[in-house]
Amino acid sequence: MKFLDQAKIYVKSGDGGDGVIAFRREKYIEFGGPDGGNGGRGGDIIVEAVANLNTLIDFRYTQHFRAPKGGNGAGSDRTGAAAPDVLIKVPVGTQILEDDRETLIADLDVPGKRITLCRGGDGGHGNAHFKSSTNRAPRRADKGWPGEERWVWLRLKLIADAGLVGLPNAGKSTFLSVVSAARPKIADYPFTTLHPQLGVVRLSLQEEFVLADIPGLIEGAHEGAGLGDRFLGHVERCAVLIHLIDGAAGDVVKAWRTVREEMEGYGGGLTEKPEIIVLNKCDGMTPREASARRSALAKASGQTVTVISGVTGEGVQPLLRQVMTYVAQSREERRKAMSGTSA
């Protein structure tokens, strides 16, 4: 399935149905009064987050959504039928923004969450509505009220517990394929990964988390270099970032700083998130090289550095346990926050 994380769509709710002019006509009743009914309400445009979608690709081909008009009123004071709503289904994690791409309308971050983007127009009044003591036979009926219309942007930020960041060829896709059932494209050249990948990491029957792999960053990504930094949005919701560094590539300190600078340039609070620094591809280094590069990286970052090999699996399980600790802590904090809000 192709991946698309941004889309612009046009939405318009239904117009209200028209009221009608009608008079009661029955045998033996010479002067039947007005009995024209009101129009029905137009359909709403509703957007709902569903759990079984992970891309906005459908909106590349369908970009206009219009709800139907309400039914017109009828004689015998009958109100027109209300029009059905149009339900637009989007992946969990979709944000809806105004046409300026800056103003947030809604963040559909949990399954079943929905928002009414455009409300249908009210139906117009039939002539029975205008009957009064001074006007016994009104010949007036209103048109239905027009529906609302707007252009909006949909922006998908995937829901993952942990995110993989690093330069191209750092081994992120290999790591994801080893620790989960995901099968991303893997090759020995930069930018093999062109869009985010998700995998579920299962440590036990009770312990699992979702891991996101995003395309590699290069220097100047926040200014549009390479694939840019647009995919960093997919790790904004993560509880912890796994910063993978290619230990066999040479200057590991420069590699770490490059990605950190790009995250700072992007913003979004990424640099405030817990970061696990991982020196990957230890199978391609001598023990002396691995020790020296680990020490240099620890000195530059001021953090503990984990050494692993995504190919052989060395050091992977302790790393996953460390990630699970952060994820469990984040889930508990979120649970407490939600229980406090509901109380």
Swiss-Prot record:
BP-aspect Gene Ontology terms: ribosome biogenesis
Assembly and binders: Monomer.
Span of domain OBG-type G: 160-328
Matches recorded under NCBIfam families: Obg_CgtA (TIGR02729), PRK12297.1 (NF008955), PRK12299.1 (NF008956)
CDD domains hit by this protein: Obg
Chief localisation class: cytoplasm
Any GO MF annotation of the entry: GTP binding
Keywords for the protein's UniProt record, in alphabetical order: Cytoplasm, GTP-binding, Hydrolase, Magnesium, Metal-binding, Nucleotide-binding
Keyword Metal-binding: yes
Superkingdom of this protein's organism: Bacteria
Protein name: GTPase Obg
Binding site for GTP: 166-173, 191-195, 213-216, 280-283, 309-311
Pfam (any one): GTP1_OBG
Role summary: An essential GTPase which binds GTP, GDP and possibly (p)ppGpp with moderate affinity, with high nucleotide exchange rates and a fairly low GTP hydrolysis rate. Plays a role in control of the cell cycle, stress response, ribosome biogenesis and in those bacteria that undergo differentiation, in morphogenesis control.
Binding sites annotated in the UniProt record for Mg(2+): 173, 193
Matches recorded under InterPro entries: G_OBG, GTP-bd, GTP-bd_Obg/CgtA, GTP1-OBG_CS, GTP1_OBG_dom, GTP1_OBG_dom_sf, OBG_GTPase, P-loop_NTPase
Record's subcellular location: Cytoplasm
Family to which the UniProt record says this protein belongs: Belongs to the TRAFAC class OBG-HflX-like GTPase superfamily. OBG GTPase family.
Cofactor: Mg(2+)
Domain Obg: 1-159
Cellular compartments per GO CC: cytoplasm
This enzyme's EC code(s): 3.6.5.-
